[in-house]
Amino acid sequence: MTKPALRSDIPMKPTVHKQEKPSVAFAHLGCEKNRVDTEHMLGLLTEAGYSVSSDENDAAVVVVNTCSFIQDAREESVRTLIGLAEQGKELIIAGCLAQHFQEELLESIPEAKAIVGTGDYQHIVDVLKRVEAGERVNHVSEFPTFVGDETLPRQRTTDQAVAYLKVAEGCDYRCAFCIIPKLRGDQRSRPVESIVTEAHQLAEQGVQELILISQITTNYGLDLYGKPKFAELLQALGEVDIPWVRVHYAYPTGLTPEVLAAYREVPNVLRYLDLPLQHSHPEVLRAMNRPWQTDVNERLLDRIREQLPDAVLRTTLIVGFPGETEDHFNHLAAFIERQRFDHVGVFTFSPEDGTAAADLPDRVDPSIAAARKDRLMALQQPISAERNQRWVGRTIDVLIEQHNPETGAMIGRCDRFAPEVDGEVLVLPSEKGLQASPGTMVPVFITGSDVYDLTGQLVDTNAMAVTAQTSQ
């Protein structure tokens, strides 16, 4: 891994002291956990009376919430920072890149007026006030311990009907390839009551889909209660008036019989399992420092299908890990072909300084790793197409997210598709010309499918919020 290539030729400008509070904009990069942090900073600044613009061009200060998970993410973050600096914007750099390279950023980008760590974003108002006073601020805790909760102001950036809820922060696992524990600290779970309170708040805002996130969501509560309490959390969220509760990052070790029973018994918990398995071969898993998984994968998947026969299964995989041979890869390909996941994401290995994998021998040539990724995705595509085709001829609920008033066409998602990472449903007006507004959940008859998406037609019913198609 190389450190981000930062520019050092931007001339330092004197800080201008103003009577009025500066206008602020946000640039959000990275994962949905980072998004929640951005939303809290937005809420805090708005509550403090700052003018927050959705357009970076209209703002004097831009808060850039960065990602540093892999090299590509770092490069995107640096490109964003340099582009804004060249526009003359004053920058507050937050997030994982700030946690990772705080000194380098301050030294190389004069426009960087403040650095805010992953465990320090709750201080964004104080940081901005210090910047206004002419101070250059480095507010980064070496060991992040903070986790936001329902008492922290929040201004959501997602569609009105979708919200992410962070149940814990940080990670206690030490996978050889992952830098996250060094950037976000050890696991800190929120109390069940705190999470449920925020879920009720989101329900009152009209949220239809609640997505639970953390680094290891199924290990929720282990640090706080001495044992995982994820099953109890799901049961408690069953009392919240939100139709869909989706779980991301369901690690295999946490999918106990009690948790699977909660998936089965709690009506609003979607039977959608996002399983970051990473690989199938025992030798690669040991090198990844995930040896416990060797005997788990097959047995776990069998148990899921036995208890949740209609479950939607997604997994993410890494190819090109140091020492991965062609035999190892073929083992993984056979595993994918045998298990027939609904959705698969494949990443090539990215060496990260500070991780055990960065020093491993037998690096796989990047061109070989890229070819393996392509081969695995080509193998998965007909499987995904087959899994989608099963829904043709059925009527399913679809959450509408976009609507074209000129054509009447709508785009939404059914419960088998998570936002951003999975497919969509193209919805045509009903036979009577009815259309649905974004944010509504409606019945759709599925008429077609492909590798990633479904196509359907709105079903005529008096039980849904619709608008009549305007005659041209």
Curated annotation (Swiss-Prot):
Keyword line: 4Fe-4S, Cytoplasm, Iron, Iron-sulfur, Metal-binding, S-adenosyl-L-methionine, Transferase
Domain MTTase N-terminal: 22-133
Catalytic reactions on record: L-aspartate(89)-[ribosomal protein uS12]-hydrogen + (sulfur carrier)-SH + AH2 + 2 S-adenosyl-L-methionine = 3-methylsulfanyl-L-aspartate(89)-[ribosomal protein uS12]-hydrogen + (sulfur carrier)-H + 5'-deoxyadenosine + L-methionine + A + S-adenosyl-L-homocysteine + 2 H(+)
PROSITE patterns documented for this protein: MTTASE_N, MTTASE_RADICAL, RADICAL_SAM, TRAM
Annotated InterPro entries: Elp3/MiaA/NifB-like_rSAM, Methylthiotransferase, Methylthiotransferase_CS, Methylthiotransferase_N, Methylthiotransferase_N_sf, NA-bd_OB-fold, Ribosomal_uS12_MeSTrfase_RimO, rSAM
Gene Ontology annotations of biological process type: tRNA modification
Xref: CDD domains: Radical_SAM (cd01335)
Superkingdom in the source lineage: Bacteria
GO terms for cellular component: cytosol
Subcellular location per the Swiss-Prot or TrEMBL entry: Cytoplasm
Annotated ranges, domain Radical SAM core: 157-386
Binding residues for [4Fe-4S] cluster 2: 171, 175, 178
A GO molecular function held by the record: 4 iron, 4 sulfur cluster binding
UniProt cofactor note: Binds 2 [4Fe-4S] clusters. One cluster is coordinated with 3 cysteines and an exchangeable S-adenosyl-L-methionine.
Role summary: Catalyzes the methylthiolation of an aspartic acid residue of ribosomal protein uS12.
Family under the similarity heading: Belongs to the methylthiotransferase family. RimO subfamily.
Protein name (database record): Ribosomal protein uS12 methylthiotransferase RimO
Organism this protein belongs to: Prochlorococcus marinus (strain MIT 9313)
